[in-house]
């Protein structure tokens, strides 16, 4: 603004013969050079304030007391002597190994993010090995909270959650979370090749395993159409892919991890109808023999579930199959059928 004012005033003086053009040009250069240090100081001050705020947050995180993991039971991959295929097994503190089945149970679980808030109240449910359990309900009903508790991102206020009969508090957090494959509504990809992004689900995976996982998710065809195929470099957060393509890569990432338990949080919400139809076949193959939890806002996306739980205000108000829920004429069906 100051520079513009000086320019206008100087131009008027030059027009009226009170100053020549050369003097005006020299004065304008002087004004710009004189103002430059102040502008740079202002920018530097803003940068320093931002850096100080970031540093305070970093030190606050570094000074936080780490959560104590009291889990003693571990979970490892073991290879079959004859088939060579890997499977999951529990390892007790004594070293005894027991095959993992994938039985997940909630017994009278109550939970709230704050002491004066209850998100889930007296929740009881179970998922047998190989079953597909779906949760439907409005936003804030507690669907995602259930999956957060399975991951043990939070501890329950009362009640118990067991995994193959083992209380999840007795399982090492790293072991528990390594056995869970999660496909979220928002897909997070990293700068790097497509193959590396898929391999993030299993860092030591071979190229053949990467391709096999992509085929399960029906992502192989679009990947091969990319300029460099699986070696195509993705920009930050996969900005050079469509939302549907990013979602397919997230599904492939879950497939390569080969988890015994899958959590699908609106995994097809950002995919068009045609793409959704493409992944359904792959998802059926991916879910075979696994315990699956599906979060959805409408019943049409969970039609093949073994059981559908309709949640409202942290409670299960309906249980049934897709067919039985569609036949209901109450509030639940009219909202999500």
PLM region descriptions:
Residues 1-28, 48, 84-89:
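A hydrophobic transmembrane-helix motif
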